[in-house]
Amino acid sequence: MKPFTFYEAIEANKRKTWIIIFVISILLFLVCYAIVSYFELGEFGILVAFLMVFFVNYYAYKNSDEIILKYSGVREPTKEEFPYLLNVVEGLSIAAGIPTPKIYVMDDPSPNAFATGKDPKSGVVVVTKGLLDLLDRLELEGVIAHEISHIKNYDVRLQTVAAVMVGLIVILGDSLKRSFYYSRRRRDKDENILGIVSLVIAILAPFLATLLKFALSRQREYMADANAAMLTRYPEGLASALEKISKNFQPVKRANTMTAPLYIVNPLKGGMSNLFSTHPPIEDRIRRLRMMGERWKLLDKEG
């Protein structure tokens, strides 16, 4: 496989991201349509379904930051405590063309970091004490650039909306399955093609949507890696940081399944198969970053 540029990696991941979001949206529509058709709710039912989707998304969008920070148990560092951290975040924010995000530290020995914020104006970068103790400045720059890329690319907003959509698909699909099995109308619909199709949608849509949510999370990690490499012009910094984090891994105590996709590496115990993982394999991320570095060196020699 030939080395690829930052721009090629970013564009490829953008395309994959929007394909995934489109397919999740189609699955949500299919589940809503199956419910409306099965219960013969008509136009009113469709309106109620879409209003529910809108309000749940809006609530998640407005409150996600506060909920995440509250559950993570973070604190604001002082300038005297970590002066280099504040300098790195400020410098990379200027380079990325976004307002300097708020910085928080989590007193946890596990080396990890995450970003949150609905948009660049409300961006937040959180790093663990373990990360600050482990990495040198160039490696820390790679990690911070990765998190700033998440903020610049509106990844938290995207992940929140996707998570809510998938959650709705799972809830609605489960409700439809229960109704199919226990409704008084079941006898009348056993041989009905619409009833069978609705049941198939109720079973498959939640499973497929969950897989797509994980795939979306992995694509955004690849994209943030590529953006970080472009921002620092030094892919090896992030590659080396990921290598160290992998070798010194331990679970983050305050992490949970809700916040896990936000971290630079999976903060929870145990690994999962690629299809069900929120993060790409670290080895693959390191390999891609070093391939970008090789391509950059070749372009420098040619130019």
UniProtKB/Swiss-Prot annotation:
GO process annotations (BP): proteolysis
EC category name: hydrolase
InterPro entries assigned to the protein according to its UniProt record, in alphabetical order: HtpX_protease, Pept_M48_protease_HtpX, Peptidase_M48
Membrane topology, as annotated: Multi-pass membrane protein
Gene3D superfamilies attached to this UniProt entry: Metalloproteases ('zincins'), catalytic domain
Major subcellular site: membrane
Record-linked Pfam families: Peptidase_M48
GO molecular function per UniProt: metalloendopeptidase activity; zinc ion binding
Keyword set includes Lipoprotein: no
Keywords linked to the UniProt accession: Cell inner membrane, Cell membrane, Hydrolase, Membrane, Metal-binding, Metalloprotease, Protease, Transmembrane, Transmembrane helix, Zinc
Cofactor(s) the protein requires to work: Zn(2+)
Details of cofactor binding: Binds 1 zinc ion per subunit.
Transmembrane intervals: 19-39, 41-61, 156-176, 192-212
Residues annotated to bind Zn(2+): 146, 150, 221
Cellular compartments per GO CC: plasma membrane
Subcellular location: Cell inner membrane
Active site: 147
UniProt cross-references to CDD domains, sorted A to Z: M48B_Htpx_like (cd07340)
Keyword Cell inner membrane attributed: yes
UniProt EC number: 3.4.24.-
Family stated for the protein in its record: Belongs to the peptidase M48B family.
Protein name as annotated: Protease HtpX homolog
